[in-house]
Structure formats: C-alpha cells, structure tokens
Amino acid sequence: MSMSDPIADMLTRIRNAQMVEKAVVVMPSSKLKVAIAQVLKDEGYIDAYAVKGEAEKPQLEIGLKYYAGRPVIERIERVSRPGLRVYKGRHEIPQVMNGLGVAIVTTPKGVMTDRKARAAGIGGEVLCYVA
C-alpha cells in the first residue's frame, strides 16, 4: 500500500525519534525530503543527512541534534497536506514564533525558509513549521 502523505511521515519519524532520543532516523528518500533536510541542516535543526542504499530504494538518514539533553526541534508540524493545500503569496507567508522558528516553503525557485522566500519576493506552498 502506498503512503498518502510522505512529508507528514517524515516529520512524524523525526518527532518520534527525538522523543526517544535516537541519534539517527532512517526513512525512504525522495527529492523533496532531501530538500527539506537541507533546509533543516542550514537552519541548524539537524546535524547531518545522507542518502544511502541502492538506486531503486534509497534511504534518507538524518542525524538528530540535541542541546543540553533536549531536542533542538521543539515543534515540527505539517501545514499543507494532500486534502488541504496551503498556498501563500509573498506578502502572506507567516512568521513562526515571531521569527524564532521557520516555515518551510516550496516555491518555483525550490524549497526554502519563509525568510528567504520573503526576501526573494516569491510565495508558494507552506509545507511545515519548525521551532
């Protein structure tokens, strides 16, 4: 059976792995998941990520980050989902926790944070909030 929302599955795997203090979480890979992992790494929410395995079924490994025994990611939640897509224009992209968190947005120029999308003057689909 196929998965209906692979991005929600990715976020849930990260959330669950951090609750049990795992160092690494493994999941099926896709181009969009790798792009989201790159944004999380650039923003300092994860240590590293790598795509491993054979070409037919690549696996994405994400190294989770902790500070003083607590997960760096306090909150990670899906916004746009298959049943209700959430698109925002360049002036409507929300701030997360008054700028302390990030919204990950997929735009025509690629996957980026809310700050970069606002600076570039482009809108897109709001995938998730991370704080």
Curated annotation (Swiss-Prot):
Alphabetic keyword roster: Ribonucleoprotein, Ribosomal protein, RNA-binding, rRNA-binding
Keyword Repeat among UniProt keywords: no
InterPro entries: Ribosomal_uS8, Ribosomal_uS8_CS, Ribosomal_uS8_sf
GO biological process terms, semicolon-separated: translation
Superkingdom, taxonomy of origin: Bacteria
Any GO MF annotation of the entry: rRNA binding
Stored Pfam families: Ribosomal_S8
GO CC, one annotated term: ribonucleoprotein complex
Alphabetized SUPFAM superfamilies for the sequence: Ribosomal protein S8
Coiled-coil blocks: none
Keyword DNA damage: no
Function: One of the primary rRNA binding proteins, it binds directly to 16S rRNA central domain where it helps coordinate assembly of the platform of the 30S subunit.
The protein's assembly and partners: Part of the 30S ribosomal subunit. Contacts proteins S5 and S12.
Family the UniProt entry places it in: Belongs to the universal ribosomal protein uS8 family.
Protein name: Small ribosomal subunit protein uS8
Biological source species: Methylibium petroleiphilum (strain ATCC BAA-1232 / LMG 22953 / PM1)
Protein encoded by which gene: rpsH
